[in-house]
Amino acid sequence: MKMSNMLVGTLREVPAEAEIESHKLMLRAGLMRKMAAGIYNYMPLGLKVIENVKNIVREEMNNAGAQEFLASALIPAELWQESGRWDAYGAEMFRLKDRHNRDFCLGPTHEEVFTDIVRNEIKSYKQLPLNLYQIQTKYRDERRPRFGVMRSREFIMKDGYSFDKDQEGLDLAYEKMRKAYVNIFNRCGLDAKAVAADSGAIGGSGSAEFMVKSEVGEDDVVFCTACDYAANIEKAPSTPEHGEKEELMEVEKVETPAVKSIEDLAKFFECSPKKIAKTLIFQADDKVVAVVLRGDREANEVKIANAIGEVIELEMASEEAVKEATGAAVGFAGPMGIKVDMLLVDQEVANMYNFIIGANETDMHLKNVNYGRDFEGIVGDFRNVTIGEKCPECGKEITISRGTEVGHIFKLGTKYSESMGATFIDEDGKAKPFIMGCYGIGVTRTVASIIEQHNDENGIIWPLEVAPYHVSVIPANVKNEEQATKAEEIYNELRKMGVEALLDDRKERAGVKFKDSELMGIPMRITVGKMIGEGQVEFKLRNGGEVETLSIEEVYNRVREEFERANLSL
């Protein structure tokens, strides 16, 4: 491609809307342009990167025995109603009606569609196992789109589904997909780690996320400092601290005027927050749920939702709902006598002695409260783990880092096949539901994550296999006929070799061309300058190193070396 013919628009200034490096650089390098909040148009340069990532995904999925097809993005409501998710998915789903007033949605995910196809096409165990995937545009009406394509309302995703006759088959399919995902992210140049995860709205049992460490990641990821254990904080089990055993004391009501926060309570009672139990009140669809935690702990809404059961939306209760449940102003809720549909008590609170709670009376608290004697509820793990707690596998300390999810694999089991009546005839002639797995990769999010891990102050540094172009050929002075002619000859020879080459034949200063090449992240640069009269050119790698002066034949070999180093063939 010649840059004089290319739709490219690099930007020197950072767009005000961009908060993170990938968003800034995707706009500055001309990979995409914003059309609306969370909606982007991909320019030629960006589309080439996306297609390169797609091709890596295709190769690894095909090598693992999966078959590609393409489902419709427009899905009739009936399929989602069969699975029970039409109402359960919530406000993120884009819903619409056709001219006959029939309900449809723009697919945020495709479990129902794949299940419908397979139940109509596969009748016997002899046709199993089966693994299908597609690379499709998805739509989710995010409450707050941000960070460019990291959280957008329209995005490209690879979603795949396996269908097996038994659990052993699913386990095998799951492991094949796990290995394929490791290969995909390695080839994309991403340092991604599989971590234990919650299944969320997808449902099912076993689940792992592929996480990329990132300071701007939206997830907290728990890592063990000694072993390979890793989990999303939503999934990671907490280790309860056991309070020192004390003699149970009589409950005492204490006036605490305008003392609401844990910090203020600790000062008022001259105690540690560990001696206080806070009561948080949630609205879970039509249920009001109270959760009791130690004062210094954070609630884990995923664990809470899982304990409640089928929950469409979990949010903090309104001030009115709190007053109705407690009979008091906000800040004085407690588990004794509270009027809620469900009372969840973190396991740590059940092991505390003589602690302080809200009295369900404005400006009043109770002290010397003990679980079991004074109140009871459903005991479980309802909080986030914290740095320094014990690893559930080896007992050593854990640490917590921010991360971005780029892939997710699930063992769905029969969740969708049973609800949608998707069955096959087994060896004994009996109808059985398909055992399913689900495997997703965010293609556009992967592109952004690559940029997050591969950039410097000058721009993007693409790994060779995903780069839009492998080599940028730059005549230092296009007005110099010899430089322009030789640059085009080198460009044409590289293309014959199978190299994706970009010839910057624009009538711009060499410095401008160098800056654009670095901003766009082209892995190799060949500069045809004054030394061309001696048969020499300059070669430079984008990811560092000195400028090398080489003959034209040597520069071709140098390009080949970089392909070999990246395990790529020409």
Curated annotation (Swiss-Prot):
Keywords: Aminoacyl-tRNA synthetase, ATP-binding, Cytoplasm, Ligase, Nucleotide-binding, Protein biosynthesis. CDD domains: ProRS-INS, ProRS_anticodon_short, ProRS_core_prok. Pfam families: HGTP_anticodon, tRNA-synt_2b, tRNA_edit. PROSITE patterns: AA_TRNA_LIGASE_II (PS50862). InterPro entries: aa-tRNA-synt_IIb (IPR002314), aa-tRNA-synth_II (IPR006195), aa-tRNA-synth_II/BPL/LPL (IPR045864), Anticodon-bd (IPR004154), Anticodon-bd_dom_sf (IPR036621), Pro-tRNA-ligase_IIa (IPR002316), Pro-tRNA-synth_IIa_bac-type (IPR004500), Pro-tRNA-Synthase_IIa_type1 (IPR023717). One of its GO terms (molecular function) is catalytic activity, acting on a protein. The keyword Transmembrane does not apply. One of its GO terms (cellular component) is cytosol. One of its GO terms (biological process) is prolyl-tRNA aminoacylation. It catalyses: tRNA(Pro) + L-proline + ATP = L-prolyl-tRNA(Pro) + AMP + diphosphate. Its EC number is 6.1.1.15. It is found in: Cytoplasm. Its main location: cytoplasm. Catalyzes the attachment of proline to tRNA(Pro) in a two-step reaction: proline is first activated by ATP to form Pro-AMP and then transferred to the acceptor end of tRNA(Pro). As ProRS can inadvertently accommodate and process non-cognate amino acids such as alanine and cysteine, to avoid such errors it has two additional distinct editing activities against alanine. One activity is designated as 'pretransfer' editing and involves the tRNA(Pro)-independent hydrolysis of activated Ala-AMP. NCBIfam families: PRK09194.1, proS_fam_II. Homodimer. Belongs to the class-II aminoacyl-tRNA synthetase family. ProS type 1 subfamily. Consists of three domains: the N-terminal catalytic domain, the editing domain and the C-terminal anticodon-binding domain. This is Proline--tRNA ligase. The gene is proS.
